[in-house]
A protein has these predicted regions:
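Class I S-adenosyl-L-methionine
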Residues: 2-117, 121
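Beta-strand/loop-alpha-helix module characteristic of Rossmann-like adenine-cofactor folds
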Residues: 8-19, 118, 125-295
Length: 295
């Protein structure tokens, strides 16, 4: 209680607090973040970019006070959040680090334009955690990407282009996995399983390969914007190495070094992501070897 009063003195009477929740358990949040959330008059949990375990959310609520869930529309159209923030202190709780997603950077900028004070309390994010956890050099990661669910006949191949470009430059890739089959961000989330991710990879690969073959049949074949895509597609997809990272930063954390072909046989966890290694050094090879089945 004394800590909460101390934090309250440091905070504005009104405004918006972007509070990083870390990776999935109360004890993983910073003391500063917990105190700020407890000191707020209203607490909103942003539940569409990532999710916490329900039991940990219950523990957090016991610790800091009542929490209300909000989804994509409430964050992207923040009129209600701003209305509250004009006369009270509002904490928006975000899994990981609150500025990891541009959605929340945009919210921060819009609050500033509206004359609403906005404070940020950072947290551990999947980007900062997973690179070292799997045993790869953080300096050798390229742009990250997200595997999305297919919508009808539409399949996004942009993640494959990111993978190919990073691979061509000798850089590893972190691929986050979608948790919303509808793409609306309004609820009914179903985080991608390893099997879903493998199927998404195959759909992307098929579409990109068909496009490559069509280009080669043209009288004057056109070079792709990504010079590494065609060479990347020459690989055997099923043998492409991948590291499955499940429930990172929690007591259920697991890491498995496998291949795309064997990925669907893995159970994974509540939330999963993938790391695609590119060229690896000796220490990186040893680091990855720990996670192979039977190691």
């Amino acid at each position: 209680m004394a800590a909460e009063k101390s934090q309250k003195k440091k905070l504005p009477d009104t405004g918006l607090l972007l509070v990083g929740m870390g990776m999935g358990h109360v004890n993983g949040m910073t003391v500063e973040a917990l105190e700020a959330a407890a000191a707020a008059d209203h607490r909103r949990y942003e539940a569409y970019t990532a999710l916490w375990p329900e039991e940990e959310l219950a523990l957090l609520e016991q610790r800091i006070g009542a929490i209300e869930r909000v989804m994509r529309p409430e964050v992207e159209e923040p009129a209600e959040l701003f209305r509250l923030a004009e006369t009270s202190l509002v904490a928006l709780l975000v899994v990981g680090d609150p500025l990891q997603a541009t959605t929340h950077v945009d919210l921060q900028l819009r609050a500033r334009s509206a004359g609403i004070e906005c404070r940020v309390f950072h947290g551990v994010s999947i980007t900062s955690l997973v690179t070292g956890a799997v045993g790869l050099s953080n300096y050798k990661f390229g742009r990250q990407t997200t595997f999305t669910y297919p919508y009808g006949t539409w399949v996004a191949t942009s993640p494959l282009e990111v993978l190919a470009n990073n691979w061509g430059h000798g850089l590893h890739t972190l691929a986050l996995l979608d948790l919303d089959p509808t793409g609306q961000g309004t609820g009914n989330q179903r985080p991608m399983t390893p099997k879903d991710a493998a199927e998404a990879m195959r759909l992307m690969w098929t579409k990109a390969t068909e496009a490559m073959e069509e280009r080669r049949l043209e009288p004057a074949p056109q070079q792709t914007m990504n010079p590494f895509l065609d060479p990347y597609l020459e690989q055997d997809l099923e043998g492409v190495p991948v590291v499955l990272c499940a429930d990172m930063g929690t007591s259920e954390q697991s890491i498995v070094a496998t291949t795309v072909g064997a990925l669907e046989s893995e159970m994974g966890g509540r939330l999963n992501c993938l790391v695609f290694p590119a060229s690896t050094g000796e220490i990186e090879e040893q680091g990855l070897a720990r996670w192979k089945r039977g190691a």
